[in-house]
A protein has these predicted regions:
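Internal gly/pro-rich beta-alpha loop/helix module
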Residues: 1-12, 17, 29, 183
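Active-site pocket-lining segments that scaffold enzyme catalytic pockets across diverse folds
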Residues: 27-60
Length: 187
């Protein structure tokens, strides 16, 4: 209230600075990574080696887009046409749907936070059931790139969720060992 009055009277912006970990304690994904030995960058690299050259990738905000960009820039054989949704949290699936409706192969690399933020898009995807659309959920249980706050995705049965929205298939990769096999079935 005082800051708003000050801002209005002086016609100047104000800011409230909050110490790290004041609102919510950061969670660590190290335990989860050790448990299933599957990192996001490992998966993205495997995916890039498995897809057709003309396949477009739309990647969600944060580390997913940065890691995809890094892999594309540093491995010349993996160059492609990607759309990095940096700052567009929750919208990668709808952009991907639009691309697929134009009869183009597209993969959406989505995060659990992003997916939960715009669940209505899942119904549109299930309704249109585009044949050239592949939706990949990278569930790390947190908004990693903006401080690691929990997404509350623990306990959600995503198979039941996408079934309810009309998705036709569901595949789950739990560890490095089954990554290639599941990607082959999925793609």
């Amino acid at each position: 209230s005082k800051l708003l009055k000050y801002s209005a009277s002086k016609n100047k912006p104000v800011a409230v600075l909050i110490k790290n970990k004041t609102i919510e304690q950061e969670i660590s994904n190290k335990k989860n990574k050790k448990k299933n030995n599957l990192s996001r960058i490992f998966f993205i690299k495997k995916l890039l080696k498995s897809i057709k050259k003309q396949t477009k990738i739309v990647s969600t905000t944060g580390y997913t887009s940065r890691e995809l960009f890094y892999l594309r820039e540093n491995y010349t054989k993996l160059k492609g046409k990607d759309f990095y949704m940096v700052g567009g949290m929750g919208h990668s699936s709808m952009v991907s749907l639009g691309i697929s409706i134009n009869n183009q192969d597209v993969i959406c690399l989505d995060g659990d936070g992003s997916m939960l933020m715009h669940m209505g898009s899942l119904r549109s995807i299930g309704f249109y059931n585009p044949k050239k659309f592949k939706h990949i959920l990278l569930n790390n249980f947190c908004h990693e790139s903006v401080g690691g706050q929990e997404t509350m995705s623990k306990g959600i049965d995503f198979k039941k969720v996408i079934d309810a929205f009309g998705y036709k298939n569901y595949f789950s990769i739990k560890n490095k060992e089954n990554t290639n096999l599941i990607l082959k079935k999925f793609l």
